[in-house]
Amino acid sequence: MLGKALGLMKKPKKTVDQSTDAGGESKAPLGDISKMLNASGRIGLQMLQKMAAVYDKVEFGRFVQQPVLVGASIQAGSLATQNRHAKEELNKTVIFEVDAAEAASSSSESLKHAIYPLVKNEYASGRFHLFPIGRVEGNDMIMPDYAISKQHATIEIRRGDYLIRDGGSTNGTFINGKRLDKKPVQIRDKDIVAFARYEFTFLFPESLYEMLRGS
């Protein structure tokens, strides 16, 4: 009581959410990444860049939680034209034909902004350790392209490892150029993972942080 009267009460301990940057300015709490994903499971590149500029690698990794798939390139080619009614085409995957005359793949600025953390949306259902990928709703990573199958592939988180298996897709799932079957294959940091014509780089939070910081 005497301490209260004299204004000698202990100052509250500073929590992680009340941390400060090098300049002494307070930083906003990092928040929950699952609440920052859009309906397709993506998170904004600019948001991540700002966070990487303010927070250290440990704090950033705590926020991201899991590895991410970062858009890299689109393979040159075209979707095969098929004589089907429009309603049928909406429900079926179209075969992707590689264009041998074009470069193997081309960089896409819009795809580079496609970053999918292996984290379920706050409203998502299903088992926590399974991360389904496909063209339609119900997947954690949604790619609305006819080259992508409805249930294209699944990534499984198993005791700190990340395993991917193809779901019997029309245009295939690839790791570093090798087509997969339904047998699970481990993905490692900086592997190139492709779904049909779309290529992504698989990055652990530490590698994502370094990429965003330009290291």
For each predicted feature, which ranges?
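Intrinsically disordered, low-complexity acidic Ser/Thr-rich regulatory segments
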Residues: 1-143, 206-215
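C-terminal boundary/linker segments immediately following FHA domains
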Residues: 174-215
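Exposed loop/turn and edge beta-strand positions of beta-sandwich/beta-sheet ligand-binding modules
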Residues: 127, 158, 181
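Residue-level signature for short turns and capping positions that connect secondary-structure elements
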Residues: 74, 138, 148, 160, ...
